[in-house]
Amino acid sequence: MNNNNSSKQVLVSILGVAILIVAVVGISFAAFSYSKTGTVANTITTGTITMSYSEPINGINLTDALPITDTAGKALTGANNTFDFTVSATVSGSTTINYVVTAVKGDGCTVADGGVKVYLTDQEDAQILAPTKVNALTKTVAGNAAGAPADQYVLKTGTYGTGAHTDNYRLRMWVADDYTAPATSQKYILKVNVYGQAVAK
């Protein structure tokens, strides 16, 4: 009788273990066998825009410059007369980037905005922005398409599509020939920035 009970206990134990194994395997299969093929293609869109320059600062610093004509200003070369910079963008996917090249006044300027002219050309020296007094330049507004801060002077706007882009620019700045400079030392600093923002899809 004891032998019979022992056999039943062993049989029940084996059966219990077998049921437990089947249950665990079944639950594991149910938990990990579900899969679904996506029906929507995943796309990653990205874009970057940068500005590079070799000068110590990102702009021009005029100090005690004399007023000159536009013809003379357009022919300026050398340090503190010109600022060479490069705008580069790498755009992938279906992104389009709106960008703007802006300028802001530096600290300690003593020449009025109406007394200074700027002139922007490309790498071939082709005119992009005609000689213009700083106070006549358009200013950025809040929420602009390129994501630039408000109240910066606009030198150039544009759009980049898919691909790699590199544009070289030269900014010239001089004291306008109709500006009457006082006898004291005069200074004007203009710093250049570039901003870019992907177009919302």
Residue ranges, per PLM feature:
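Compositionally biased, low-complexity repeat tracts
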Residues: V22, T43, E55, T69, ...
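Intrinsic-disorder/low-complexity loop/linker signature
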Residues: T48, G59, G73, G93-S94, ...
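Extracellular adhesion/glycan-binding regions together with long Ser/Thr-
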Residues: N2-N4, A65-T77, Q127-N168, R172-M173
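C-terminal, structured domain-capping segment
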Residues: N81-K105, P149-K201
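Short, polar/proline-rich extracytoplasmic segments that appear immediately after membrane translocation
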Residues: N2-K74, Q186-Y188, Y195-K201
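Intrinsically disordered, low-complexity, compositionally biased regions/tails
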Residues: L20, M51, T63, T77, ...
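Surface-exposed interaction patch
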Residues: S33, K74-L137
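Generic preference for hydrophobic/aromatic residues in regular secondary structure cores
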Residues: T50-E55, V87-A89, V118-L120, L171-M173
